[in-house]
């Protein structure tokens, strides 16, 4: 806050009056701008701004101490307010100065100079980095510094509604043309003596003078237009479009009020105060939009003024003293439009000028030397009463829109002032009020008429301008006083020419503007060239200034003078003097202003030259003016202005010295900023490289994820295929198990059948043995019979020899015997038929036996094949089970390896995360280092908020990770329990497999035993076959012998013709024999049927047992299949869950990395966006970033702790799971051992029990067989006794037959002797065959006539009887021996055929004995032949 004032002065009455003070409110950072107040303590609008508040605010913000801002206020009494109003309306600046500061002007000027010299460096020292021009202005350059940076800074922030008497608050929003200035109040045409001075640039005189050169104006305007970027344009246009519809109803009314003549200055200020509060609330964007609206309205108003007041040419001849005073007035008005120097776009900094309008009115009637410009209007004060408002952004925006809109009307940025002293009838002639002639422009296009020469040498143009103006100054003396109109017309023509030139040059500006955007790299070179050109131009200007031939121009090159209507009270010479003063003033000010644009080394020498040249110029002007205005009033004023110019030059020199120091400081700052920019570029490159690396890593991670997903899919497909194959194999195994069970049942059935076959074979072998014994006995009997027959034949021959003599007597007997023989032959034929039937039956039985044996062989072969298949399937199943077990073990190993790999991957990922964190920490440190030099407070707050969000996200993520870790721990516990259950199931399956393997071993042993037994049976069968062959051979030999015996029997029967009784007995015996034979055959058939039934029953029992065992095998296979399914399901679930857990862990880790990468990307984007803005608050950012780093370190430390805890918990759980698995494995192994031992013990006990049962059965069978043998022996004994009785009876019959034979023999001998001669031939004819053996006996002469000796016959009969008795004894002995042997063999064979009953043995013995008895009877019958 600043204030200006003066000392109190008494009025005419001498009464004290309240003082009026002018204040400016300097708002805090972030407000819209500086706001000026002019008032007195009694006003309502000024009551809220006491001096104490102003002092405190200044002391708190600027820390000036006892500087310029602590100067006393200018007190104005209420009586002088009317005069102050009139002077302000009429444009009488000296009158206003006189009212505000009636004391010595020199002292006040010195005080103001000192205050300004103190204010500028102090304000600069206390400027924050935010307020520096290089940070906020893109067109800033160190060479463009003005005399007062404070005023420049304040002029940037001025508002439209600042408190000045000539302010128009705001414009309507529908006006499109851009304006830089507030609208001034203008009087009517009859009362208007002066115009408005418009402040359109900077507040410094340096920029004013420099900008008055046309070439400088052109170059600066072009540079200003070129340095506007597209981003600023878009922002401003958007701000204008979006935020204009505010305060439209109030602004035109305010403008109309300000246009009226009678409206005072101060009543506007309360409304301005209200608008200020509204501006603070609305913000920056609304402020920009309303400023734009003000510019638009000002542009239209100035266009109307220009049309209303056509600009005539001002007189070029004015007194030198008036020009000096004019120079002071303009010097007091800080304004500069174009302070852009080419090449400043690289540093993104430029000054922006603001123009201030003064308005003076020619109603001051008492001018004097005191009415010269007061220090109150000094340019270094930063603001004046009549400052309207403008902003640096106005000028940039106007220049930009001027390039876009060529035909829109604009205003001039700088107007030179022209004071005119007029004489009144009631006042002295010496007093002439100063009139400020307003120079303005109609068109906005003319505002930028010299921008084409932006990249050209601006200073060379300025020198040419001075050269062109030199003849004008020389021609001033030659011009007559009446040449005012011609000069005005000439100036008007020049103005029109310049406007046309500007219109032609606007089109080229657009092309150059686009080219300048592409030539950013060459701007540094252009800066250096422009600096050298400025130096060269400064030397040229020093020469031109010493000659005094330069003429000043406005900042825009549009120094058009608005014509003033001459009243009746004004004279033509006054107009001339005012115009000459204007020219002299314009001649002086460019020199002073241009000195500021030169290098610091040239300022001192040039200031010395300026002081001398100014003095010479004044003297020349005095001579030229001659004696027209050399009265007592004008000469002191000229002298005062001269003194003021000297003071100003001194101030300028001092200020230039300060500027040199400041320039050096700013150059150092620029170098530092350039270094910082290079560092920021490097950091940008590093960040971009890091981004690229992170993107590559993300791409790699995504590829790895895709590959893992593909591998998982392939694994799932393989797993499904394997599961299907396993199911198919399980089904096949089930089928195989079923077939195995069926085979086992068949094996058992076949084993039983083999046992039965063995038993049957044993029986057959026994029968064969018995038959062989019988055959041997029969052979022995036949041998005996042969011997007996031979002896009988011999006896018969002897008897025939003896009975030849008795043949004749026996013819009749022979006939009888022949009949008997026929009968016997018939009987023999019947016997042969019976024998054939018996043989056929035996053959059929043999065929049946052979067929049974072949069926048994086939069955054995099938059984062997089935056993082989079973063995193969068993081996295959064993191999499959072993393979499955190996697969299970391999899968367990793979799972363990996968778990280990997962652990390793987790460790590797943790290491990578740590490395990423280290990188992130390094990157964050680098970013922090770059941020500490570049970031702003607001963006830092955003980053802090983002960091807080990230911190919250990290907390949320940590909580989520903890929850996920808990879920994973639960899943691990569930998996462990499932693994335990699976292991238990594995152990159970292993136990079942062990049991099945034991069962299979038993089956194999049984099979091996059955094979051995089968081999034994085959060997026995082969032996039996050989025996059968021998038996058949023997049977054939027996049949042959039987045939021989039959032939012999025929012979014997021929001899037994006479034994009729014997025939009858033989018939009886034959009938009995036949009955016995039939009974024996029936018994054999019954026994065979019983055996068949018993075999069928046994087969049924075996089939039942086979079915039962098959059902048990099916149950076992079903249980096995269920266990396999459980195993497969467990195998499927365990790896899938492990993979799912690994995938979740990887996804979590990737999500963490992605979140961190996203956070880093956001940070990088915010860093890149906020580089420029965050430069000014380095210290605060450092502190904040240190805190952030500490908090991040804490967060990372907490993260590490949580991760370490999670890892430890997982490792502990895994170790516990492994220990439990090991324990369970040991327990299961022990259980297996115990189960095996239990199985072995149970099997042993079962075997012992079965052995005991078998032993008990064997003992029982032995006892029963012994009893049976005893009973059979007793029966055999009884039978034997009966047979002995029968034999005794037979022997008695034989003895009787012998007696009968002896009697018959005696009778035969008698009959033979009687009928020898008669019946010899007839006997031979009738019985040739029978009588053939007796032929030799008949021829034998010796035997015919012999006598019969009966003693010899008796001896032969006795021998026969003795022989038969011996045979009977042998037979008895053999029978007893056979019975004893059969009993022993029966005892030995009872265990194999325990089911064989005693009745069957009895029947077998009877069947065996019957043919033996028959043979004996035959032999006995044969022994009964008549001897």
Swiss-Prot record:
A Pfam family this chain is assigned to: CCDC144C
Name assigned to this protein: Coiled-coil domain-containing protein 144A
UniProt keyword Coiled coil, yes or no: yes
Role, per record: May play a role in preventing the formation of kidney stones through inhibition of calcium oxalate monohydrate (COM) crystallization, attenuating COM-induced apoptotic injury to renal epithelial cells. May exhibit antilithiatic (preventing the formation of kidney stones) activity through crystal binding, hindering the crystal attachment to renal epithelial cells, a pre-requisite to initiate inflammatory response.
Low complexity compositional bias, start-end: 543-552
Gene, per the UniProt record: CCDC144A
Region described as Disordered: 1-32, 87-189, 213-261, 453-485, 528-586
Record family assignment: Belongs to the CCDC144 family.
Originating organism: Homo sapiens (Human)
Comp. bias regions, Acidic residues: 224-234
Basic and acidic residues bias (residue ranges): 1-11, 528-537, 563-584
Keyword match Membrane: no
Chain coiled-coil ranges: 490-545, 648-1129, 1155-1309
Keywords: Coiled coil
Composition skew (Polar residues), residue ranges: 129-150, 167-178, 453-467
